[in-house]
Amino acid sequence: MTDELFREDASLVECTATIVAVDEAGVVLDRTVFYPLGGGQAGDAGTLTAEGGAQLQIVDTRKHPTQPGEIVHIPPAGAFLGGFTVGTKLVARIDAVRRRAHMRFHTATHLLCALIPHPVDGCSITASYARLDFHMNEPLDKEQISAGIARLVKDARPVSHRWISEAELDANPALVRSMRVQPPRSESGLGRVRVLEIEGADLQPCGGTHVANTAEVGAVIVTKIEKKSAMTRRVVLGFAEPAEGRG
């Protein structure tokens, strides 16, 4: 089982690790800072650098398709893996700019949930945009929601996480905002669920990476609102600052 360092500290950009498996799915490490695709958030990219200096690009990160609890680091198709075998010690480093964008957008989607009190019917978080689909038929105002996000960002509210028991979650079903995806239950068998809290604004199960304070979300605005169906309104978020100003 991969030790998921990002669960407790999303600000980590690198760690030392040892390869425990290499198969058709990718490279598996004993520990990692790479977040795998999940909860609507894209997987991390970055590099693995072996002790001898060999470097392997990682273009995506996923949960292992057949080994529960393991994370696979996916190299480009056809990449040479000669220097990366079981037992190789290395430094795993994520693309920090890409991760930071994921963290800002993911926290911003929780601010959306605070502003739009309806169930979530879909989610996607990338380095260039984020979107949430809300189960509702009422119209939404783009400028009003952008202003609400800006207000919560300006409030500089602390963002934290904690673990609750699965029994506690089951006793409080209103914590779950997603209609289609169930909260990530612990694969360790400990029977616990990770909960994200934005002080005074949002509290819900979430396994993603987030900033530590809403002020760090920065200039995020609503770029589009779409009526996807009679009961679905899609809200798309984007950065208001130029790409070179991010990091």
Tell me the role of every PLM-derived stretch:
Residues 1-247:
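Active-/binding-site microenvironments in catalytic and ligand-binding cores
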